[in-house]
């Protein structure tokens, strides 16, 4: 390791201090009226501990669960103010009452204090039966700091019971936050999927780009320009250590972890043109995957850890291609929507991908279904949607979206993402993979770019 590398690592670690920010809030903009109705009743507590709970300013468990289910796009949680009565136990449930409201699922819960811990219990009740039937229940004894995580865990359990799909409410996201801070304009941040518990991982006066989670959620790979040119960093989140620094001449960027966690794909221009490379993380050996005079970048892995989707301009404009890492002659185009297509992100089950489609002066997020060959636009109401990332369960995706103060988006499509004028803010958006549900995360103090969703195995 060179003296420069050691100094650089110390700089990164010094800037790693955990800076907390105000939480963001999800604002649903489209699709909630078509979702399945459900009621999450405020959790009850013993009268003798009510005062202690209030003074402790604990998280509102029921509100978090309701928000999670609503944010999935599959449930419409009935506002508490609309409930004529709030049952506290199973025997209080009157099925005919809920039937008139069009609700056949109700969540009841309670919170108590045991020693210095909190005991959270809940029941998921089917009100279409008479008498009402408990179809799921559980209890947790936890420390106060784990209240929000426990609420997300309950949401995951309820979501999977009702849909058969694993929930993603306990996952984390990472993104780059751009602010007006003169000293540190760029920050790599992580947060809960809903924007709460935001933490700064790294701050820099130079651009940070393209964060990517390891499959176990313990590391992030990202691009930094702290040294004056691009370098690729792999950083462990628990102890703040730098595991790898990839710093070849010219461009180093677009990292992507293989699903098995054994390899990292990225793009380099050390030979002039941008080409794809793979590092074996156990040996640090680097293998070149593409070797031509075109720009090949933005790799995304298929589930087998043997095939990559990537962006290439070998046909004249950026399109998405697929290549086998063991046979670089087996490369073929897989995107065909009008205009250009780039920045692919493959679903964890490998059945579809989302990508950025540029066409007629606008930029959308589009989807390609590998099973049917169908391509469709998911964000037709967006002007400059970018960098999509699919949720681990494959039913949602996040992306950055530019709010243009200038009415013409065409002025900016040929510019680099980091050069978009400061008066146009980039926000974090959330949408269902069928395009029917959309929401924005509001409350950030700056522009959010390059969002990426952790795997199901990632936790706090």
UniProtKB/Swiss-Prot annotation:
One of the GO biological process terms: protein import
Family matches, as SUPFAM superfamilies: TolB, N-terminal domain (SSF52964), Tricorn protease N-terminal domain (SSF69304)
Signal peptide: 1-22
Keywords attached to this entry: Cell cycle, Cell division, Periplasm, Signal
Coarse class of the protein's main subcellular location: periplasm
Subcellular localization, as worded in the UniProt entry: Periplasm
Gene Ontology, cellular component aspect: periplasmic space
Coiled-coil regions, chain positions: none
Domain of life: Bacteria
Role summary: Part of the Tol-Pal system, which plays a role in outer membrane invagination during cell division and is important for maintaining outer membrane integrity. TolB occupies a key intermediary position in the Tol-Pal system because it communicates directly with both membrane-embedded components, Pal in the outer membrane and TolA in the inner membrane.
Summary of subunit composition and partner proteins: The Tol-Pal system is composed of five core proteins: the inner membrane proteins TolA, TolQ and TolR, the periplasmic protein TolB and the outer membrane protein Pal. They form a network linking the inner and outer membranes and the peptidoglycan layer.
HAMAP family given in the database record: TolB
Family: Belongs to the TolB family.
Annotated NCBIfam families: propeller_TolB
Protein name: Tol-Pal system protein TolB
Source organism (scientific name): Blochmanniella floridana
